[in-house]
Curated annotation (Swiss-Prot):
This is UPF0200 protein TGAM_0868. Keywords: ATP-binding, Nucleotide-binding. It holds the Pfam family AAA_17. InterPro entries: NTP_hydrolase-rel, P-loop_NTPase. It comes from the Archaea. Transmembrane segments: none annotated. Belongs to the UPF0200 family. One of its GO terms (molecular function) is ATP binding. It comes from Thermococcus gammatolerans (strain DSM 15229 / JCM 11827 / EJ3). Gene3D superfamilies: P-loop containing nucleotide triphosphate hydrolases. ATP binds at G7, M8, P9, G10, S11, G12, K13, S14.
Length: 190
């Protein structure tokens, strides 16, 4: 089984990935693949360079470039684990790449929705080097994500978590969903 986790930046995707990892299931981050490719190309890991490499990869290999690069890693992990989580899928082309590469695997899409203002505040507080510090930067980043096609992936989700309350409420939702998916794995569904 493959679980694809998607959502806008700052929505709470990584918390879902962490919950699966805590239970022994491995993950592949498409963002990490772009960062690795940036380093391979001899570039410094800056927001601008990572964005340029992401665009260049898609120009060189197609809109599903990052997914194509991830397929080998996912395949290796599926040999050792009945469930692999893929974090950061941003387009239906990427979903299609995984469906095509793994026709024998059940693929579940989990999307997280968090209101924009709340995501902006969380990203500012998180303070990662590539997190926006102004509302204008935040909106620009959101529009880039939407142009990549993330809205289509969110719309096709099998499960949608709404993250608009307290941290404790979201934790409970995440654990409940992860348990449901794992139970489905053991029964052949979800």
């Amino acid at each position: 089984m493959i679980v694809i986790v998607t959502g806008m930046p700052g929505s709470g995707k990584s918390r879902i990935v962490e919950e699966f990892e805590k239970r022994g299931f491995p993950s592949v981050s498409l963002g990490d693949i772009v960062r690795e490719e940036t380093v391979k190309r001899g570039l410094e890991l800056t927001k601008e360079n990572v964005a340029k490499v992401s665009i260049r990869l898609r120009q060189e290999l197609g809109q599903n470039a990052v997914a194509k690069l991830a397929v080998g890693k996912v395949r290796v992990l599926l040999e050792k684990s009945p469930l692999v989580v893929i974090d950061g899928v941003r387009s239906l082309d990427e979903v299609g790449t995984f469906r095509g590469a793994f026709p024998e695997e059940k693929i579940i899409i989990v999307a997280v929705h968090t209101p924009p203002r709340l995501r902006f505040e969380r990203l500012k507080a998180r303070g990662r080097h590539d997190d926006p510090q102004t509302w204008e930067d935040f909106e620009e980043r959101d529009w880039k994500e939407l142009r990549f096609g993330i809205g289509g992936v969110i719309a096709m989700a099998d499960h949608m978590l709404i993250n608009d309350g307290s941290k404790e409420e979201y934790e409970k939702k995440v654990k409940t969903l992860v348990e449901k998916i794992i139970r489905g794995l053991n029964r052949g569904g979800a």
